[in-house]
From Swiss-Prot:
Domain of life: Eukaryota
Compartment(s) of residence: Secreted
Any one of the GO CC terms: extracellular space
GO biological process: antibacterial humoral response; defense response to Gram-negative bacterium; defense response to Gram-positive bacterium; innate immune response
Function: Sarcotoxins, which are potent bactericidal proteins, are produced in response to injury. They are cytotoxic to both Gram-positive and Gram-negative bacteria.
Keywords for this protein: Amidation, Antibiotic, Antimicrobial, Immunity, Innate immunity, Secreted, Signal
Signal peptide: 1-23
Name listed for the protein in its UniProt record: Sarcotoxin-1B
Residue(s) carrying Arginine amide: 62
Pfam families named among the record's database cross-references: Cecropin
Lineage: Eukaryota, Metazoa, Ecdysozoa, Arthropoda, Hexapoda
InterPro entries linked to this entry: Cecropin, Cecropin_insect
Species annotation: Sarcophaga peregrina (Flesh fly)
Broad class of the protein's primary localization: secreted
Keyword Ribosomal protein found: no
Length: 63
């Protein structure tokens, strides 16, 4: 009976420490994904600006 209590206690302690180390790993991946999303957003905004300028040039050239 005591062995079961000790085993459960040790398992809980290991789960707590493993959960904390996992959070750091997941946080790093989350930040990388967020950074990729920000770069994609910025590139899209730049492409839209260039496309609008090209459309303005084409409209001006047509007269």
């Amino acid at each position: 009976m005591n062995f079961n209590k000790v085993f459960i206690f040790v398992a809980l302690i290991l789960a707590v420490f493993a959960g904390q180390s996992q959070a750091g790993w997941l946080k790093k991946i989350g930040k990388k994904i967020e950074r990729v999303g920000q770069h994609t957003r910025d590139a899209t905004i730049q492409v839209i600006g260039v496309a609008q300028q090209a459309a303005n040039v084409a409209a001006t050239a047509r007269g």
